[in-house]
Amino acid sequence: GIEGIVNGMDPTEWNPATDKFLDITYDKNTVVMGKAAAKQALQAEVGLPLDASAPVFGYIGRLEEQKGCDIMMEAVPKLLKQCPNAQVVILGTGKKSMEKTLEKLDKLSPRMAGVVRFSNPIAHFITAGADFLMVPSRFEPCGLIQLHAMQYGTVPIVASTGGLVDTVKEGVTGFHMGAMDPDGLKPDDVEAMVDTCAAAAAAYGSPAHTKMSATCIGQDLSWRKPAAKWEAVLEEMMFNSGYGKKQMVVTPKEDLEGAKT
């Protein structure tokens, strides 16, 4: 049979309790206050208005079609129009055409920040300070970015594909926007992303959102569980193949008789 095992993440690099880039670290017991401080730091870093009540949507990654960035670039202006207090920050590099589009989006609104470069500190600021992390990938064998987000109590908004389906539970640890068309940019996909993000924005600050964030950060997303599954699968494969079993050696009768003479 086929066994699917999702990735784990490195808690030594991605851990809000020990993150060297955060002025105020936090854990599952202090996630509400910690994320509020991280949001303020993120807004100041990328030039967004300092507004604690604004739902902040983030994206970190390559700017390319596989990651659904063309969908996101079309969706963001609609989202900002539909949700007047929402803020968006996008960090990434990739296709030159998409980098230029992101530079244009950066000038679209004071509530939109586009950072066209790689920055590890800003990646950590977004992971901690955003309220939602957008992952609109057309395909994603497993993905790590959604695990990083949940580790920090940031709720992922994901396309329903690959490992994103396995790691993000609708209404429990995130929002699903449905599967994206793999063959090109479709208006229905853009609308699905806008609608899902708008629904998340409407839920922001509610008890349901607070519970979702707490559920995210309360998970063990390290390699401990995946490693145990790998070990169990490999042991089963070895057993089924007969590897390591003692082989019974039967000596032919004529050889035994010959040995007596």
Regions found by a protein language model. Give the residues of each.
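Catalytic cores of carbohydrate-active enzymes across secretory and cytosolic contexts
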Residues: 1-261
